[in-house]
Amino acid sequence: MKKSIGILSPGVALGMAGSAMSSKFFLVALAIFFSFAQVVIEANSWWSLGMNNPVQMSEVYIIGAQPLCSQLAGLSQGQKKLCHLYQDHMQYIGEGAKTGIKECQYQFRHRRWNCSTVDNTSVFGRVMQIGSRETAFTYAVSAAGVVNAMSRACREGELSTCGCSRAARPKDLPRDWLWGGCGDNIDYGYRFAKEFVDARERERIHAKGSYESARILMNLHNNEAGRRTVYNLADVACKCHGVSGSCSLKTCWLQLADFRKVGDALKEKYDSAAAMRLNSRGKLVQVNSRFNSPTTQDLVYIDPSPDYCVRNESTGSLGTQGRLCNKTSEGMDGCELMCCGRGYDQFKTVQTERCHCKFHWCCYVKCKKCTEIVDQFVCK
């Protein structure tokens, strides 16, 4: 299915009278949360909008027209401007960031680096200052999360500047099937995510050929890879109509893929990520020219990964001491690899689970609680 990608014009919202009050409540609460958080900030990031949801205020009366975008930690100047223009979008930027963070932690739950977050607005700590393949994945999955959240918010009528998808009818859709319904607006989600997420990188100016300029190019590439993964995995969904489920007629629409599928695809890209360097013209090129050049959907990195085996404040590595491991596994979650050869401790723990469940007419399921003593293994 062919999908078109356009360019967002922030001026679309200038003529709007204002966004919904609920979005203002969200922004005010978020600003209050960060203003009282006493933390050491190493490097602000918009990812912080996905951390620690502020207290929901059901009835707040705000005097004044503008939300407190300028007080939100983690936003660049360009992102703050977009915040002012699109007040009702910010809640879904936060939801997208949260979705990306959770997916990162799921995908790396059995790895030495498990996408741990820290208690400040850098979210992932100093480890993101290294242009590693882990950083590449994090940028990609976070950008993907924003596309996902924005596209769905449009479909659900939560935003003032978009609605259901207007994607063209696929050419391979049978003629007697209707193209309609209310699909996820992936075009809009893609465009706004690109405008917002890339704003910080595009504002940064560094000398041509510098390490900082290489990081900007790396970040922009991986942001795009995340967005395109969501875009390309979207597919047609259909609903049958007809007497007694005969499905004599179908209505179809464009639908986002489950985000786990996006995470799985990006994890595969992480495993095959391309090592890059800056050439004399200030462009990223592959370190090993024998391989095919990475596409816009591949992940790229410029630094080797730090040693995640031991705690290191300078690199942000938390180490693997105290991590649970699987004694019988030969994979990355196995005690030999997870514990980096340091060995492991064994202890017993009591687990309680539902068991012996029975269906009773009508209509409920009744279960017993079973306890079991199990062995667990923890890295030294």
UniProtKB/Swiss-Prot annotation:
Keyword Iron attached: no
Matching InterPro entries: Wnt (IPR005817), Wnt_C (IPR043158), Wnt_CS (IPR018161)
Paired cysteines (S-S): 104-115, 154-162, 164-182, 238-252, 240-247, 309-340, 325-335, 339-379, 355-370, 357-367, 362-363
GO biological process, one term: positive regulation of endothelial cell migration
Residues listed as glycosylation sites in the UniProt record: 114, 120, 312, 326
Entry keywords, A to Z: Chondrogenesis, Developmental protein, Differentiation, Disease variant, Disulfide bond, Dwarfism, Extracellular matrix, Glycoprotein, Lipoprotein, Secreted, Signal, Wnt signaling pathway
Subcellular location: Secreted, Extracellular space, Extracellular matrix; Secreted
GO CC aspect terms: cell surface; clathrin-coated endocytic vesicle membrane; endocytic vesicle membrane; endoplasmic reticulum lumen; extracellular exosome; extracellular matrix; extracellular region; extracellular space
GO molecular function: chemoattractant activity involved in axon guidance; cytokine activity; frizzled binding; phospholipid binding; protein domain specific binding; receptor ligand activity; receptor tyrosine kinase-like orphan receptor binding
Tissues and organs where the protein is expressed, per its UniProt entry: Expression is increased in differentiated thyroid carcinomas compared to normal thyroid tissue and anaplastic thyroid tumors where expression is low or undetectable. Expression is found in thyrocytes but not in stromal cells (at protein level). Detected in neonate heart and lung.
PROSITE patterns, sorted: WNT1
Disease in which the protein is involved: Robinow syndrome, autosomal dominant 1: A disease characterized by short-limb dwarfism, costovertebral segmentation defects and abnormalities of the head, face and external genitalia. The clinical signs are generally milder in dominant cases.
Function: Ligand for members of the frizzled family of seven transmembrane receptors. Can activate or inhibit canonical Wnt signaling, depending on receptor context. In the presence of FZD4, activates beta-catenin signaling. In the presence of ROR2, inhibits the canonical Wnt pathway by promoting beta-catenin degradation through a GSK3-independent pathway which involves down-regulation of beta-catenin-induced reporter gene expression. Suppression of the canonical pathway allows chondrogenesis to occur and inhibits tumor formation. Stimulates cell migration.
Protein name in the entry: Protein Wnt-5a
Lineage of producing organism: Eukaryota, Metazoa, Chordata, Craniata, Vertebrata
Protein's gene: WNT5A
